[in-house]
Regions:
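Short beta-strand segments enriched in hydrophobic/aromatic residues
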Residues: 26, 40, 96-98, 139-142
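Short, hydrophobic/aromatic alpha-helical segments in well-folded domains
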Residues: 18-22, 79, 121-125
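Short beta-strand edge/turn micro-motifs at domain boundaries
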Residues: 91-93, 117-152
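A solvent-exposed, acidic/Ser-Thr-rich amphipathic alpha-helical stretch
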Residues: 32-102
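Extended, polar beta-sheet/loop recognition surfaces of beta-rich domains
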Residues: 148-162
Length: 162
């Protein structure tokens, strides 16, 4: 493999790591704005499944923190990262399965609505600046849902509709 091929593999590995770091932060409830600034560009846009848009690392982290207080825990599985590179810009398509357990759900394991799952496709654009890849735009197209979806219509604050 030549140097260009090696550089491409390194970039794709770094891009995958950034995308995975975002979902890991959600699962670990690490909503520190400084941490989100290492994942997102200053004007990054995250479009939620309901069409609401969040702009910038601070708004993204604050909105997720507010939204995720409803959950006892969550787990996001991101796989099949397909990455197209064009210089310092990358486009990513990946599959996502997310499971969320409602607060208090551990108190009654027999309840059928103590969790919900959703599966879909994420699309993201990342840009490389000063040797670091960061997400500049991300959206999640939900393809299916299962479980107790009762409270998910309200997904936190947002500044704009997409």
């Amino acid at each position: 493999m030549d140097q260009d091929g090696i550089t491409e593999l390194i970039n794709k590995s770094e891009i995958t790591s950034v995308v995975d770091s975002y979902f890991r932060a959600l699962d670990e409830k690490n909503f520190d704005a400084q941490h989100f600034a290492s994942i997102f560009t200053p004007q990054a846009k995250v479009t939620r499944p309901n069409g609401a848009s969040l702009i910038g690392p601070e708004e993204i982290s604050a909105s997720h923190e507010k939204s995720f207080t409803r959950f006892e825990g969550s787990q996001h599985f991101v796989a099949g990262h397909h990455i197209s590179l064009d210089g310092s810009t990358a486009n990513v398509r990946a599959n996502l399965i997310a499971m969320h357990m409602w607060q208090g759900s551990k108190t009654d394991a027999n309840k059928l609505d103590n969790f919900f799952m959703a599966g879909g496709v994420i699309h993201a654009t990342l840009v490389q600046s000063d040797g670091q890849w960061r997400i500049s735009q991300m959206s999640n197209a939900v393809l299916w849902r299962a479980g107790g979806f009762r409270d998910m219509m309200q997904t936190g604050t947002a500044t704009k509709k997409a």
